[in-house]
Amino acid sequence: MQANPDFWRGRKVAVLGGTGFLGWHIVRQLVELGGSVRVLALPPRADHPIHDLEPVELVIGDLRDAASVRHAIAGCDIVFNAAAVVAVWGPALKLMDEVHRRGTLNVLAAAAKARLIHVSSIVTIGATRTGKVLDENSPFTLGRLRVDYVRTKRVAEELVFAAKQDVVVTNPGYLVGPDDPELSITGRFCRRYWRGRVPVAPPGGYNLADVRDVATGHLLAAEHGVTGRRYILGGENHTVAAFLQLLAAAAGWRPRAFAVLPQWMMWAMAECCELRSRFTRREAYPSRQGARLLRYFWYVRSDRAARELGYSPRPLVATIEDTHSWYVAQGLSPLHGITKWWLRP
């Protein structure tokens, strides 16, 4: 699976949110293919690798600011809107609503003459309590789910489809992989586990996909995607407990049967963590909205993307091995305490 270099060579492309996990991998692949890339992002850290990637043009701005969005998109043939706020707790919840609603409207106005690849999420596809696998045509049944990330991503998708422009919507799974410069939510979970801080498995399950393959899938969506259509760009469906087994194997630890937290205990932990966060100002982990997500199995299939785009992700075990190697190279701290005894080889 690879994008067509002839399609991208010399093409002017804007990547909104190009310093985030997915956006960064899209930018890297575009540069490797010879694209002329402009990135719109909030000020990145001084050590972010975007500073060393030539010949990327970095525009500092905010999706909520229409002028900076117009500047970033001006003259570009293709626009990837990978800018988003991913949060299940705290002050970022209000920001998320502004970015996903007002920011999407700003992008649609500025990209009226370009092909827009709108990055959504599998959360807009839906989930079940039974593990049923869903696709792009499955009815959405979580309209009453009180999770702001799900609600605002659905709103953004509805705005995109209502615009009747040259837009392709992608629905990536939960992203895993190396080269995670700003440490995504899934990346933080992996690091927390490899540091011995996840002794039991949360309930629920996810579709987990390699960020590198999903980035390639976005390029293929720009090349071959049908206007007005959604494409799930996923990987493998696993319970969280099974995912932890894969993380353990990548670290060379002996496999363990992880106890799965019952829902009531997960909710009690979330209540306690949110109460503590009011005093410490630190992230509530888990939060109540995060606990609501973990009531479900977010299982999907990518058959349409495979058929129409040529999307073909690698096995998840290879992804996790690469991810662990990257974290070790970044100085991942060793196990400690009781988890060192529990997980030792």
Regions found by a protein language model. Give the residues of each.
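Mid/C-terminal beta-alpha module of Rossmann-like enzyme folds, strongest
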Residues: 217-285, 302, 307, 318-327, ...
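NAD(P)H-binding glycine-rich loop region in Rossmannoid oxidoreductase-like domains
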Residues: 46, 54-102, 110
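N-terminal Rossmann NAD(P)H-binding glycine-rich loop of SDR-like oxidoreductase domains
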Residues: 13-33
